[in-house]
Amino acid sequence: MALKKDFVKFDKVDKSYDGKVLVVKDLQLDIEEGEFVTMLGPSGSGKTTCLMMLAGFETPTNGEIYLDGKAISSIPPHKRGIGMVFQNYALFPHMTVYENLAFPLRVRKIPKDEADKKIDKALSMVSLQGFASRMPGPVSYTHLRAHETRYD
């Protein structure tokens, strides 16, 4: 039987957005070509961050990511040959637009006054200032897309 080589490899990968809190810590993951892998975990556990790093939309704070044996952490997304379909709108239906936007900031332990400023700025950038207290259900598809706004 021939030895299979790792097709995707996360080698001791860390990711921090603020330089303090690690959202991905010491990830060691080896995926063989043709292998099917499912990442499971609660909201805020780093699943999407790992996929964003693999696709090149985020960079690891430490460690290296390999694709077919080649280090790719410094290669821009358009040169990696990886397609990415962003996750379905993972909004909490029991929380307002504001609370949905605040959730990842709370996970990252951003102080409330700083989080409020970031949320106000994000809502303003996508012309949704008046939607902060609404539930996501009555928000249109276009507005749902705006929820994917990045803060950094």
List each model region and its residues.
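The feature captures the beta-strand-to-loop junction immediately N-terminal to the Walker
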Residues: 40-42
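Conserved ABC ATPase "signature" region
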Residues: 9, 69-73, 106, 111-131
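Short coil-to-helix segment of the ABC ATPase nucleotide-binding domain corresponding to the Q-loop/switch region
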Residues: 95-103
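ABC nucleotide-binding domain "signature motif"
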Residues: 61-71
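Helix-to-loop junction immediately C-terminal to a conserved catalytic motif
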Residues: 55
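Conserved ABC ATPase signature
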Residues: 74, 134-141
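Conserved small/polar residues in nucleotide/adenosyl-binding loops
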Residues: 45, 142-149
